[in-house]
């Protein structure tokens, strides 16, 4: 059996060509230098994903600096409202990142209180449960939640964002003492101006 050259895609991660690829995917056939390159690449990938100082969010989900500029100017709620209203050229990516940040701010216990006040057959219960499930998913893995939100059709995403914003406003009305996302954004801006 003749030794084939190692697949360059497999060396640098994973080959997507499947059976069409004519190069070797059998690591036992590979020369030592190819194995070392693959091992080095995989170790760097693991190290990068574990390093908290590197902004993996922008690399993995595409949350670029432009999105953060919009968020700084408009605030999280402003970005989401702009996306719903199709103004300020807010991208789906920006909206999903802002939505993830809003979900961090909302306490699921507050939503459960609102849900318990509803009639048993109210359609709002389903909306509350959906938002609660997004909050719990976001707490476990916010990058995966951003990815799930991005996969929603635009109209469904807009409806989900609108429902979440409505719930957020209801919580603020029922708990006026708690600081809101907008208040925190304003406070950050004031600190930047004065500091």
From Swiss-Prot:
Q: Does the keyword Signal apply?
A: no
Q: Name one GO biological process term.
A: transcription antitermination
State its location(s): Virion; Host cytoplasm; Host nucleus
In this chain's numbering, which residues are marked as the site (Involved in RNA-binding)? 8-9, 92, 151
Which terms in the GO cellular component ontology are assigned?
A: host cell cytoplasm; host cell nucleus; virion component
A GO term, aspect molecular function: zinc ion binding
Q: Which Gene3D superfamilies match?
A: Pneumovirus matrix protein 2 (M2), zinc-binding domain
Region annotation Oligomerization: where it falls in the sequence: 32-49
- What ranges does the record give for the region Binding to the phosphoprotein, renumbered to this chain? 126-163
The record's listing under InterPro entries reads: Pneumovirus_M2-1 (IPR009452), Znf_CCCH (IPR000571), Znf_CCCH_sf (IPR036855)
Q: How is it modified after translation?
A: Phosphorylated by host in infected cells. Only dephosphorylated M2-1 is competent for viral mRNA binding. Cyclic turnover of phosphorylation-dephosphorylation of M2-1 is required for efficient viral transcription.
The chain residues annotated with the modification Phosphoserine are 58, 61
- Region span, Globular core: 76-171
Anything noted about its domains? Contains a zinc-finger domain on its N-terminus essential for its anti-termination function. Contains an oligomerization domain. The central globular core is responsible for binding to RNA and phosphoprotein.
Q: How does it assemble?
A: Homotetramer. The homotetramer interacts with RNA. Interacts with the phosphoprotein (P); this interaction is required for protein M2-1 function, localization in host inclusion bodies. Formation of a complex host PP1/M2-1/P allows P to target host PP1 phosphatase to the M2-1 substrate. Interacts with the nucleoprotein (N). Interacts with the matrix protein (M); this interaction directs M localization to cytoplasmic inclusions comprising viral proteins L, N, P, and M2-1 and mediates M association with the nucleocapsid. Interacts with host RELA. Interacts with host PABPC1 (via C-terminus).
The entry's family comment says: Belongs to the pneumoviridae M2-1 protein family.
This chain belongs to the protein called Protein M2-1
């Amino acid at each position: 059996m003749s030794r084939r050259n190692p697949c360059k895609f497999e060396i640098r991660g994973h080959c997507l060509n499947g059976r069409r690829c004519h190069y070797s995917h059998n690591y036992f056939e590979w020369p030592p230098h190819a194995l070392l390159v693959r091992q080095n690449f995989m170790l760097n990938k693991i190290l990068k994903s574990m390093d908290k100082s590197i902004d993996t969010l922008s690399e993995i989900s595409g949350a670029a600096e432009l999105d953060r500029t919009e968020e700084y100017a408009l605030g999280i709620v402003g970005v989401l409202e702009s996306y719903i209203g199709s103004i300020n050229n807010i991208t789906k990516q920006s909206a999903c990142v802002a939505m993830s940040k809003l979900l961090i701010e909302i306490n699921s216990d507050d939503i459960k209180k609102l849900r318990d006040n509803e009639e048993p057959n109210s359609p709002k219960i389903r909306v509350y449960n959906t938002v609660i499930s997004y909050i719990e998913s976001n707490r476990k893995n916010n990058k995966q939640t951003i990815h799930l939100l991005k996969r929603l059709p635009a109209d469904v995403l807009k409806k989900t964002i609108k429902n979440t914003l409505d719930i957020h406003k209801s919580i603020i009305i029922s708990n006026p003492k708690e600081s809101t996302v907008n208040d925190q954004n304003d406070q950050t801006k004031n600190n930047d101006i004065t500091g």
